[in-house]
Amino acid sequence: XNPPQDWLPMNGLYYKIFDELKAWKDAEMFCRKYKPGWHLASF
C-alpha cells in the first residue's frame, strides 16, 4: 500500500512530522482524532 501523502513509511507503519508545537497529551489526542487507533510516536 502506498503511504498517505506527506507520510513516511517505516517497518510497515506510517509516520508524519508536524511542526506545530503541542503538549504531549494534546498531541496524542490529535493523533487519535486524526485516525482512530493511531498514536503519537516517540523516538
UniProtKB/Swiss-Prot annotation:
Show the coiled coil region(s): none
Q: Which domain of life is it from?
A: Eukaryota
Which stretches make up the C-type lectin domain?
10-43
Q: EC number(s) on record?
A: 3.4.24.-
- One GO CC term of this entry? extracellular region
What enzyme category does the UniProt record give?
A: hydrolase
Where does this polypeptide localize?
Answer: Secreted
Q: In which tissues is it expressed?
A: Expressed by the venom gland.
Care to name a GO molecular-function term for this sequence? carbohydrate binding
The annotated modulation of its activity is:
Inhibited by 1,10-phenanthroline and EDTA.
Keywords, A to Z, come to: Calcium, Hemagglutinin, Hemorrhagic toxin, Hemostasis impairing toxin, Hydrolase, Lectin, Secreted, Toxin
What's this protein's family per the entry? Belongs to the true venom lectin family.
What is the protein's quaternary organization? Monomer.
Q: What does this protein do?
A: May have both metalloproteinase and lectin activities. Induces local hemorrhage in the skin of rats. Degrades type-IV collagen, gelatin, laminin and fibronectin. Has hemagglutinating activity on red blood cells.
Q: What's the protein called, per UniProt?
A: Jararafibrase-3
Question: What is the species listed in this Swiss-Prot or TrEMBL entry?
Answer: Bothrops jararaca (Jararaca)
Species lineage: Eukaryota, Metazoa, Chordata, Craniata, Vertebrata
